[in-house]
């Protein structure tokens, strides 16, 4: 396993959207993450007042959550944090590495959304991240994760049109799955409205449900629920929301 892939420069180099936070912000504008997060909090911890979000990106979801909770956001990438501070100056957003960050505050809710956890590839470093989650929790605190729990194994090309501020872009996507490392690689080719082209290679670690359960339990979190966007009784993936309570 190759280790933590979330050093700021490599991540920006391999993901067009991280190199262009404004474009990321537009493309993520229809994200349902904040709404799902609020629903899960209402269900499992309706009296929550404080929240920390690891991997907050441009702060789009945090902006919604901050209407209800006192929030702090952390992200590893200075470009994302700079953009977030300019676009949403009312938010408390900081540069931080979720393997080692310590705010010296315990929060009612700890979140790690948008596949952030999937950029940590090494088992020991995943353990470090869960220790960070626990360091910011007290008895009764919620942990809410959104991460891949099953691989995308189809190898056929997929093409989509993405609206950008300068017009529609065409993106072609191919997935690869390495079972030994549990890494799903997504390769994207962008044809931009300007006529320019860009390439992406995004590598995400799939942490299967029973693995997630074990990582959480080792640091004191008990799993309450795992659900995907279908909200059905059967978990199908490939991405799931995991809710756990600190005991």
Q: Where on the chain are the PLM-derived regions?
A:
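A short beta-strand submotif of the Rossmann-like class I SAM-dependent methyltransferase core
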Residues: 112-114
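A short acidic, Gly/Pro-enriched loop at the edge of an enzyme's catalytic core
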Residues: 102-109
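Class I SAM-dependent methyltransferase SAM/SAH-binding core
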Residues: 59-100
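Conserved class I S-adenosyl-L-methionine
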Residues: 2-57
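SAM-dependent methyltransferase
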Residues: 144-215
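C-terminal lobe and adjacent flexible extensions of AdoMet/dcAdoMet transferase-like proteins
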Residues: 211-247
């Amino acid at each position: 396993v190759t280790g933590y892939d979330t050093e700021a420069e490599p991540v920006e180099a391999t993901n067009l959207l991280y190199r262009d936070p404004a474009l990321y912000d537009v493309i993520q504008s229809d994200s349902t993450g904040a709404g799902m997060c609020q629903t899960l909090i209402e269900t499992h911890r309706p009296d929550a007042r404080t929240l920390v979000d690891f991997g907050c990106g441009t702060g789009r979801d945090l902006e919604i959550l901050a209407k209800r909770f006192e929030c702090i956001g952390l992200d590893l990438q200075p470009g994302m944090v700079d953009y977030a501070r300019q676009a949403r100056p009312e938010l408390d957003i900081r540069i931080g590495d979720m393997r080692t960050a310590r705010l010296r505050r315990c929060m009612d809710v700890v979140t790690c959304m948008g596949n952030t956890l999937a950029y940590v590839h090494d088992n020991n470093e995943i353990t470090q991240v869960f220790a960070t989650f626990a360091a910011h929790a007290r008895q009764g605190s919620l942990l809410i994760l959104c991460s891949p729990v099953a691989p995308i194994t189809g190898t056929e090309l997929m093409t989509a049109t993405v609206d950008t501020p300068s017009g529609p872009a065409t993106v072609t996507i191919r997935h690869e799955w390495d079972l030994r490392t549990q890494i799903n690689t997504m390769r994207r080719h962008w044809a931009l409205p300007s006529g320019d082209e860009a390439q992406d290679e995004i590598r995400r670690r799939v942490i299967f449900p029973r693995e997630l359960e074990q990582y959480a339990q080792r640091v004191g979190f008990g799993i309450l629920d795992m659900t995907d966007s279908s909200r059905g009784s059967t978990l199908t993936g490939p991405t799931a929301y995991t809710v756990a309570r600190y005991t």
